[in-house]
Amino acid sequence: LRACVGKGFMDFFNEVDADVFCIQESKLQEGQIDLDLPGYHQYWNYAEKKGYSGTAMFTKEEPISVSYGLGIEEHDHEGRVITAEFPEYYIVTCYTPNSKDGLARLDYRMTWEDAFLAYLKKLEEKKPVIFCGDLNVAHKEIDLKNPKTNRKNAGFTDEERGKFTDLLNAGFIDTWRYFYPDTEGIYSWWSYRFKAREKNAGWRIDYFCVSESLKDELESAKIHTEVFGSDHCPVELVIKK
């Protein structure tokens, strides 16, 4: 995030004027940055390990309550989840663990996925859920430029894709795909290597998902491919209420 702030972050932040603005992989510790965001409440979840992971949420309306993590010790050392409760719904920001080179963390990733879905369903017992973040998976072949060469790579394994399918089958909507079911060539992440962004050799791994009960409230979804400053670009959801 510190690098982004020097690359137009505040211009974008002010331009979109979001009611809720979420960040994943902030790579910050407490006190390392002081963002001046008039009119916003700021919530940060830091990883115990320095310069790693982390999430943040900035909200215009003060939430009823805010919680950090999943409430499961083995999953809550890396600052990956923030949940804010509002009158009509919960908003959750999530930075899903990367399965890493050689799929070194794939087994851990699978346990995380099950715990995260169970967490969302528990919230949903009380009110609908909107969750967003870097979910570190391209769901279908149209969600990345080079599916054939990435079948066994982190972010496109059958196991990871299957967990995202489970999430949709559990009653959540991938909002961008809801509006654009067949659109190809729109991505949210590009490697810094191989001139990937220049060639648009990207992956769509950043999502807004919502409970099925919010389907009629969906107004628009957007992936801001024109915004630079990171290897990811921002994604946006507009709802009616």
Predicted regions and their residues:
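Active-site beta-strand termini and strand-to-loop segments that position acidic
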Residues: 60, 84-87, 211-212, 237-241
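Active-site metal-binding loops of divalent metal-dependent hydrolases
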Residues: 1, 26, 135, 233
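Surface polyanion/phosphate-binding segment centered on an Asp-His-Pro turn
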Residues: 222-241
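Conserved beta strand-loop-helix elements of the APE1-like EEP
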Residues: 50-65, 186, 193-216
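Short, acidic/polar
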Residues: 2-15
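Surface-exposed cleft-lining segments at the edges of enzyme active sites
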Residues: 71-72, 96-113, 148-153
